Structures are given as structure tokens and as C-alpha cells.
A protein has these predicted regions:
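AAA+ P-loop NTPase catalytic core
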Residues: 3-252, 290
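Short regulatory helix/loop adjacent to the ATP-binding pocket of P-loop NTPases
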Residues: 201-205, 308-314
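Short glycine/proline-enriched turns and hinge-like loops at secondary-structure junctions
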Residues: 185, 267-269, 314
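Conserved catalytic/switch belt of AAA+ P-loop NTPases
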Residues: 228-237, 255-309
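Short helix/loop capping segments that flank catalytic or ligand/cofactor-binding pockets
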Residues: 195, 223, 263-265, 311-313
Length: 314
């Protein structure tokens, strides 16, 4: 219930607070990250939001564990170990997730030098490990990679995902961001597996529906409105007009591929991107047909794009 959730959040805060002090682990991770190049331009607010999302996932993991182990919930050393180790993991992916590969490895070494928390072997980067909710300790992701037999008839099928350390790592982080209900951007060169990462992750998350749309240089807000008409449901409520997914028990993910392709207008605005920002920041949009404000509920956006340094990208 709400009381237990609040108590759990306060317990987590008590364990996290020492690392959030000035010149503490989180402060130094933030400063280090902002001083290095990312695959896309980033800000302190974006990094802090990412960390908050992963911290929320930490709390969800504890709540789910306690629901499954009501007779022996997570307490004492188990709870403390899980929180502080998950804190390091959250800092690793929130502040370092969009760094270049070489900088990410250096970031892992920097984290090791800053904390007295027992961390796994320094022979491998921290990104090859995860924190297990069952004991609160670090374990190798390699131990979680299942052995699969691939049918030769499906070897050329691009929808087939062979589990690896990389796919498992991406899935864990992606699930946390999707559960936060905040927009997500996947950025990487062509063929790096952006679409595959999302598709593979959603296989284990049945409470999401996804619709994909490919952006081009001429994409306009009208395309998003058509998506809403087809996959959403407008409902009149005492608080005004509300747009929800057609399936009331699910969240609709609008996957916008090549999201940085639309051209700027003469005022320097990418109109479809501004429209998406309005929905995300204001929680709705102005319907041009009915001249009414529409509040959106359970609709989430995920974008994929090539690095902005590529030709034709904005």
C-alpha cells in the first residue's frame, strides 16, 4: 500500500543520501560525464532524470521481491547491499550510458577509484556485471546468457535475437526507462540494433503495445495525429477530452524511427518534433479539428536516430 511504499522510499533515501552529498560519488560522476563527449548533446538535467528513472526501478525491484517473498522480505544487510550496489549500477548507466565506448571504460575505472563499495573484478568493465535482487551482490551477465539452438531456416531472419551479454544489458536498462513512462531516445549508427533492442525488450513486457512510424525529411504533426486516430480512443470526461490507447489496460508506445530526419522550417523549427515535445512536456495537444485541448494518458514515445553528426541529420 501507499504507506509501505513511502516507508520503503525513505529507507532507500537513507542509504543513498551519503553518496549524494557535495563532492560525493554522484556529484563527481555527474561532473566527469559532463566533461566528456556523448553520442548526442546532453545536459545535467537529462543525466539527473536518467538517474532518477533507474533509482525508481531499484524501488520497484525491492517491492516486487517483497511481494514474492512476503514471509522473508528484503531487510538488513541484503537490503543495504542491494541499494548501494544498485546505486552504483544506476550511476554507471545514467551518467555513462551515452558516453563513447572508450570513455565508458574509463568511467568504469573512475567509479572504482571513487567508492569503497566492494565491486567485482577489475579485469572486466562493470558493464559486464549486474546486481542480483536475490542477494544484492554483483554477478556476471555471462551467467545469465542462455544457450540457444538456432534453426538454420531462421538464420537470415532479422527478427531473431541471439542472447548475448550486450542484449541482456540493453534489455535491463531499456526496461527501467520504459517503466518510468518517460520518452526514450536510442542513438547509434545504422545497423547497431536500435529497433531490435526495443523489440526484444517488449517481448517480456506484455503491458505495452507498440506502433512504429518511420520519419522522413517531410514528416509533419499530421502523421502523429493519424497514429492517434488509428490506435487511440478519444473519450469525453469531466476534465475534458482525453486520448487513451485503444486497449485500456495497456500503454501505447509510439516508436519514431529516424526521428532527427525532419527538415527545419523557415523559422528553424522541426514542427513534428515540437509537437512531440508539447505532448511530453504539457501532457496533451490542441486538436486542430475540434479546437479542443486533448489530454494524453498512457501514451509514450521512443525515438531512434543516427548520430546528429551524420549527413542530413538535424
Amino acid at each position: 500500500d501507499a504507506k509501505k511504499t513511502l516507508e520503503l522510499q525513505n529507507e532507500v533515501i537513507n542509504d543513498v543520501a551519503p553518496f549524494a552529498e557535495k563532492h560525493g560519488l554522484l556529484d563527481q560522476c555527474m561532473a566527469w560525464s559532463l566533461a566528456h563527449a556523448h553520442i548526442m548533446e546532453t545536459t545535467a538535467m537529462q543525466l539527473a532524470t536518467s538517474f532518477s528513472c533507474l533509482l525508481q526501478q531499484l524501488i520497484r525491484n525491492v517491492m516486487e521481491y517483497n511481494m514474492d517473498h512476503q514471509e522473508v522480505p528484503m531487510t538488513g544487510d541484503h537490503f543495504h547491499s542491494f541499494v548501494v550496489n544498485s546505486l552504483v549500477e544506476a550511476a554507471l548507466y545514467s551518467f555513462g550510458g551515452s558516453l563513447m565506448s572508450s570513455d565508458l571504460h574509463e568511467f568504469c575505472r573512475m567509479i572504482r577509484s571513487l567508492t569503497t563499495i566492494p565491486l567485482p573484478s577489475s579485469e572486466e568493465p562493470l558493464t559486464n556485471f549486474y546486481v542480483d535482487v536475490n542477494d544484492g551482490q554483483w554477478h556476471s551477465l555471462q551467467t545469465c546468457v542462455p544457450k540457444v539452438n538456432v534453426d538454420m531456416r531462421t538464420i537470415l531472419d532479422t527478427s531473431v535475437v541471439i542472447p548475448t551479454v550486450d542484449t541482456l544489458r540493453n534489455q535491463r536498462v531499456m526496461e527501467a526507462f520504459l517503466n518510468s513512462r518517460l520518452p526514450v531516445i536510442l542513438c547509434g549508427p545504422p545497423g547497431s540494433g536500435k529497433t531490435m533492442t526495443l523489440s526484444n525488450c517488449l517481448k517480456t513486457m506484455p503491458h505495452f503495445d507498440v506502433v512504429s512510424v518511420n520519419f522522413s525529411s517531410s514528416t509533419q504533426p499530421s502523421l502523429i495525429l493519424k497514429i492517434f486516430e488509428q490506435y487511440g480512443c478519444y473519450q469525453k470526461t469531466p476534465n475534458g477530452l482525453v486520448l487513451r490507447p485503444a486497449s485500456p489496460d495497456k500503454t501505447l508506445i509510439v516508436f519514431c524511427d529516424e526521428v532527427n530526419l525532419p527538415e527545419e522550417d523557415k523559422y528553424g523549427t522541426q514542427r513534428v518534433i515540437s509537437f512531440l515535445r508539447q505532448i511530453v512536456e504539457q501532457g496533451g495537444f490542441w486538436n486542430p479539428r475540434d479546437h479542443l485541448w486533448v489530454q494524453t494518458q498512457n501514451i509514450q514515445f521512443v525515438g531512434a536516430c543516427n548520430p546528429p553528426t551524420d549527413p542530413g541529420r538535424v
